[in-house]
Amino acid sequence: MHNLVILGASGSIGQSTLKVLRRNPGRWQVLALTAARSVDAMVRDCLEFSPRFAVMVDEAAATALAGQLKTHGSATRVLSGQAALCEVAAHPDAHSVMAAIVGAAGLAPTMAAVRAGKRILLANKEALVMSGAFFMEAVREHGAELLPIDSEHNAIFQCLPEAIQRQPGYCDLAGAGISRILLTGSGGPFRYTDINALAQVTPAQAIAHPNWSMGAKISVDSATMINKGLEYIEARWLFNAAPEQIQVVIHPQSVIHSMVQYKDGSVMAQLGNPDMCTPIAHALAYPARVESGVEPLDFFSVGEFSFIRPDYERYPCLALAMSACQQGQAATTALNAANEEAVAAFLAERIGFMDIARVNEATMVALGSSPVGSLDDLIALDGAARARAHNLIEELS
């Protein structure tokens, strides 16, 4: 049986992964589930899936989980801390690792899985945004297999020739007859909102995505469209694409998840209802296909497809991310760190919606040209960018 580790089991992607497993009993064995501090969810899922290991980042949460599992007679071994995350991600019995921890916190365990040569189901886009070339070099050096979970990158992956699928990060798009990648995005909940009203947007409004059901952080990222900017950077590394080979297209219906345009004029697109269970099922079973539980697309009810050019005045964070991709690794690392801090401050109602872009830009300008020669340099830069962003947030609060 295929052993699976789910990093970030209590989050949106982790829960969708478990949903796909329920649709396909007996195909995968859950080796480990991890979470930060969601004890109740972990008790429920450990009792259902009987993993060998359960890891809580928070030590008090681990103690609480261990006590409750013991009461239920569970044999699951409970571990705690960042080192334990890395340990289960690289466990000799693990075949695939779902990397679904949100943000920079997911980099270390994801990299541990890469260095152990695992099949990585990559939902943590920040790992690539933060570490780019270092991450892809580790994938190649250690023989890891990389399968994208983001709906857009999974769609692009499915539209590429099999030879390209087998060597992400080191493929030759032009040599395979590909002219460009068309990266689609819904435009978020404010694509038609008066620009002058965006400063008054509340967290509750920002997390109400019109098409997708997602966590709070990624919902805000979608509203600012920095999510699409981070995906632009991720696509650059995943598919060895030059920035000019990637075009962002706003597609409000969220039915076409992305496209690949070939030099002969053909365009390959991957379509489906907006549900993360589809790309998760694809990556879990690749190259086979399994039930995802997602309703088949009904073309007659969709009605129409529309496409809009991005408005960078409305979406300054998207422009910042694309600029960071041109600048290089330090800029993307600084931007990602600043954005995590800024979004957390916005959700806590400490800064306004448009302040997110201000914090991101000021941090990127200050630190985006820092020298980075190693992963340790990137981690240090991440910390410096967070400190800088924190100071800016204090000034704006």
Swiss-Prot record:
InterPro entries named among the record's database cross-references: DXP_reductoisomerase, DXP_reductoisomerase_C, DXP_reductoisomerase_N, DXPR_C, DXPR_C_sf, NAD(P)-bd_dom_sf
Binding residue positions for 1-deoxy-D-xylulose 5-phosphate: 125, 151-152, 186, 209, 222, 227-228, 231
Record's keyword terms, sorted: Isoprene biosynthesis, Manganese, Metal-binding, NADP, Oxidoreductase
One Gene Ontology biological process: isopentenyl diphosphate biosynthetic process, methylerythritol 4-phosphate pathway involved in terpenoid biosynthetic process
EC assignment: 1.1.1.267
Annotated positions binding NADPH: 10-13, 36-37, 124, 126, 215
Entry superkingdom: Bacteria
Keyword Metal-binding attached: yes
Cofactor annotation: Mg(2+); Mn(2+)
Keyword Transport included in the entry's annotation: no
Job description of the protein: Catalyzes the NADPH-dependent rearrangement and reduction of 1-deoxy-D-xylulose-5-phosphate (DXP) to 2-C-methyl-D-erythritol 4-phosphate (MEP).
Protein name: 1-deoxy-D-xylulose 5-phosphate reductoisomerase
